[in-house]
């Protein structure tokens, strides 16, 4: 007796349709699973056996061999429990459908779900990736857990059926027309936290302006300042001024978090991610990896913000791993038998104190760090990383008068978001025929063609380049930031004043310039 069923697993971020072949023959009672299963799939033998019995079916006391294909892909999803169980029931004749009809149904249907010993179905990670891959294989029907089905309703081309138990799935297979598809209310409860607002940040108007520029042009930022000056407040409020996620971005962001097992609700993510890893985070947790090649923090921050607080406290090799994603918006994770390309398109914000105690150069509090400690701390961030930063901000401790200023004098997130949307709209119109949609993503070869620089600006740019010893990359970033400032002003051309403002964010005063920057010069 033989049956073929389709299940799915996840390889990196991508789903892989798995062919589950079940053969039941005469012989001693044996239940074998072959086809490169990992430990979780091997253990499914006991879960499937108990679930079938406890759901009121008979488990065949014969030789059962389950083959999972393709053989070269490692099967790591416990969601293969359900297709294995359905295969056993179909091969043993316990699903009461005529064989031609049953065979046709099984050939066009995907089964995904982890089984409990009592036959109940659990939520499976990576369901969106599996469903998207099923579409490519022309599989348009999915049976899964009720906890998963609400996510699948967001893919219009797929008909999804959800159930709580294995017995209910079998009933649905035999009578799918009697199943009523419940509509899912996507009320965007994941909206940006309304309790945080840039209006709460007093005395940091220059920092707020830099955040507007970063949000409008998708530029990377580094903030330097003493403890308590407001660096974290500026960073964590950045998502409140970013444009809302598009439908495609919501689907992609949700898929990433679903594979990582971090999806809190069974609905699409509505707010842009904000990730803030601790400085003790490992390299694998930042860039991705591990035994199952899970996405790291930089991929979880895709289409959102990655905040590296206390950046000099991170191991240097961890920070240096950001070089590729900051430039290419992708990260390649290599494993023994495969390599994975993960998206990593985010706004990076680095925050640092000027020294270990935090008060080097402070006019009111004396620094207690030795020269050796200063030297070691201030060279933790390498030059290549700094060369990829667009905006540098000195965040000073606000004065007493700044703290007492009226709310009406401080820009709110709503005011800043309006400016950001204006800048983004100009970029969308400019880049409508381009694969990139932001100034920060402008490739080197397109900068002069698309930035629209006034002819009389080249003299200033030449003086700046020679005086401050720019690299080619940092000069490109100056032009990109200037273009964003011009967009915020509604200007079609980059003017001298736009370049002058961009230069403000490339210059760091001497008393904090030792963090990768020397002699008070521009990075």
How would you name each of these model-derived features?
Residues 118, 308-315, 358:
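Catalytic P-loop NTPase motifs of RecA-like helicase/translocase cores
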Residues 303, 309-310, 321:
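Walker B catalytic acidic pair
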